[in-house]
């Protein structure tokens, strides 16, 4: 681009051409020419070019005085471009900003309502306390403007200014005005008034007249505005059942809306207003289930489907059988992401757990069994767990619906049979099948706890398909799976399985690698088998007890249990000992499940329907921090950083004192020892090093920096804010310098550049370094070597106009900073800047 004409001839694509170094100067000249010629088309093209540069991150703030010259133009497009530029650079040009305020205020009373609204929005977006007074005046005037566009803009500007300075507004005056504007006839003004009131006075209460007005105007709002209104209405409590029904009748058609946010907001109102009317709420549940199913299946976004699915899952905590007839809609699709498949499995589990039709339960169980071979271990585990829970939940109905036998014969036993093919499969198949087998064994234990009568059926399969091809030790099973197999052997010790020899082999090969709970289960199983087969089990039991009692330090808990079992066997007869150990076999009824407690917890977040609480599965107080908590955490973080820095300084000083004391003590104690000469030699060497260090001629050579220091930007910022200025040096440069050359020289010496850039004609560079204490003469003891290394942080500012370089140093150890680091830093800096010491 070499002339002004290029702006006219280049077309729309010219805004995205390659940036040239001389572009800003050319734009400045062309803009001045276009202003003098009063050529609106040229001004538009130039301003569009400037805005493009601004959006890609290029600093065009130098053009601020020239751009504000066209702010008084009557062209709306030019005004939009100018105001966009001014708002973006308002903070970096606070002095020049006052030159635009008069233009903005003049536009706030323009005849054109679009210009009035544009000027008002820009004036409120300056985010400067210098313009706050002027903006407040215009806001108060515009709240009563005859144009709805200006009034709704003024309301949003009011919310912005209130957060900028709460003292600028008298709430006793401004809040009644906002309430009056809620009764406005313009729908957008009403919505903005509600939103502004939410910002200024959260939790404000409705009146009947206000609700009636909102309901009358409700159909005029757009769908997102309706969501805002409904969210506020969820805080309103109708005075009677008739009032509730009137509101719900007006909102009924919103349940079938294609916007999922609007549908969920409407459902929240329906559930809230019928909470005290059980019969009506049952009808509401029936009314909302089909819209939810439709939204879940018709949504093109997986994220939306996931959100709807979570709300369906939450509704099932209130109405467990609500979706019983719709269970096929929750079958996993081949292209569903894992997070949706996992949630669908949970929904299917709850549907089947509360299902009464055996055919439906069988279909769900068969569907879940197919997911076991999906390939993902997480989904496999969820599916097996769901199958187990479904069977357990139907324990009391097994006479009518023998779910336990169906689960055992169609799912668990076939999986155990498949596992016998492990030996002939490839490595990949072995890994997958072993993972499935582990989940099966763990769930099988939970299944048999509820249905112990099936133990005699399961153990032969385990003996044939797992133990019969080698033994449990041939499989790389996790500890929980090993513990499950051992538990099953102990619960049926009189079976035909060779339990003593299985236990012996497991003890010989795997015992030492197992965690405590597996060792404890092995010990308990050994005792139970011993009571039924003492002749075979006695030698093995002696070895196990001896092993468990031998080492107290390794496993004190197991040691105590083994001593307890030993005393039972020695002090009591076999029958009494067996009655004590086998007391857990007494018949107990399992009626309460963890899922029931989870449902109660889910019921507590029902009031936060259509919020993130539903997705997170926790109340908002658990993941949203208030301002006080955030402020306390910030103060605690700064305090921790301060203590850390103080510990570095104090640690080095204490180490030096301790070393001196230790040296004096060693000198006194070693006077009569044979190694006196060696100690004297060490002391002389240390004294010599101290003399070298204290010598000005060796001030730099004995100071070594870490060549690969690490410091995060967050920690750098925290240190910079918490440390006081250590030393500042000003250097007048003769000519501009190459930042990359300085960075290259510094990095070779262990001084690393964290960030650099140019802002407002000022180049900024930030460096950090750490001292390598392994070369320090006081860094001798192992304790000292564990101390953090001293940190040095540097800021270099170069004025691009005057070429004045200002260097600011900070460090928690000022003595080392002044005596060692600064001379070394300046010595390194003299390489790219030779005249630095002149």
From Swiss-Prot:
Topology within the bilayer: Peripheral membrane protein
SUPFAM superfamilies: ARM repeat (SSF48371)
Compartment(s) of residence: Golgi apparatus, trans-Golgi network membrane
Keywords: Golgi apparatus, Membrane, Protein transport, Transport
Region: Ear, residue numbers: 674-838
InterPro entries (UniProt xref): AP_beta (IPR026739), AP_complex_bsu_1_2_4 (IPR016342), ARM-like (IPR011989), ARM-type_fold (IPR016024), B-adaptin_app_sub_C (IPR015151), Clathrin/coatomer_adapt-like_N (IPR002553), TBP_dom_sf (IPR012295)
GO biological process: intracellular protein transport; vesicle-mediated transport
MF-aspect GO terms: clathrin binding
Biased composition (Low complexity): 652-683
Main location: Golgi
Highest taxon of the lineage: Eukaryota
GO CC terms of this entry: clathrin adaptor complex; Golgi apparatus
Region of interest: Hinge: 582-673
Residues covered by region (Disordered): 648-683
Family membership noted in the UniProt record: Belongs to the adaptor complexes large subunit family.
Subunit and partners: May be part of the adaptor protein complex 4 (AP-4), a heterotetramer composed of two large adaptins (epsilon-type subunitand beta-type subunit), a medium adaptin (mu-type subunit) and a small adaptin (sigma-type).
Biological role stated in the UniProt entry: Probable component of an adaptor protein complex. Adaptor protein complexes are vesicle coat components involved both in vesicle formation and cargo selection. They control the vesicular transport of proteins in different trafficking pathways.
Name of the molecule in the record: AP-4 complex subunit beta
Species classification: Eukaryota, Amoebozoa, Evosea, Eumycetozoa, Dictyostelia
Gene transcribed to yield this protein: ap4b1
